[in-house]
Amino acid sequence: MFPLVQAARAQPSQGPGDLALTGPTLRVRVPRSDDAAALFREASDADVTRWFSWGPYESRAQAEAYLERLPAERESGSQLDLIVERLDAGPIGISGLSEFSLRDRRATIGTWLGRAWWGTGANGESKALMCHLGFAVLGLERIGSYTSVDHVRSQRALERLGFGREGVLRRFHRHGERVLDVVVFGLLRSDWENGPLREVAVTVSGQPPPAFVVAGSALTAR
């Protein structure tokens, strides 16, 4: 499914604003203000945002407002959203880690991609990059994910990538006037080390924001 694993190569140290992880066809990196046009284009599709509590975007200003609040979220350690970009096509979506508990060494992953990139392998590669970030760089021990009980395609995708189905949280996610049940998935460090996401070749450059790094992890010891 993925190219054979290569040792992840750390590039020369840069600041947190330069964090990027690069795979065979994708890169995840810190968002910039000039990403607004691409995010508006991809997230103005109602099918793309169907399962989320926001969207679809109706103006570029909404994408700009989203990008403007991200630096404060990175500074506080509340959410680490990164641009997913094709190396040959530019930004195609967002993948992020949230619900951090550094004490428990866990976080939750969420991803959205433009419709043109569904079924292309971009979801799997972007999650491989983000899970490498979480486990190998930040020092996490668990990455979880939620998906609606009705979103069967997402559930199957998570299972293919090695996430384990752990149960259902009833009336967990408010979606407009509805409150949805969600299926909980989890990926432990040991699952990742022995699963398909670990097979993706990853190059890391820059440094993550300090608020997301587990004390004593390989990054802080480096």
Across the structure, where does each feature detected by a protein language model lie?
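Hydrophobic residues in alpha-helical segments
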Residues: A43, F52, R74-E75
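A generic secondary-structure signal
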Residues: R69-L70, L133
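Acyl-donor (CoA/ACP) binding surface of acyl/acetyltransferases
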Residues: M1-A46, D81-R222
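A short hydrophobic/aromatic micro-motif that marks alpha-helical segments and, especially, helix-coil
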Residues: S59-A61, R74, W192-E193
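Secondary-structure boundary/capping residues
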Residues: V48, Y57, S76-Q79, I143
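Short loop/turn motifs at secondary-structure junctions and domain boundaries
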Residues: A72-G77, F163
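Conserved GNAT-fold acetyl-CoA-binding loop/helix
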Residues: T49-R69, L82
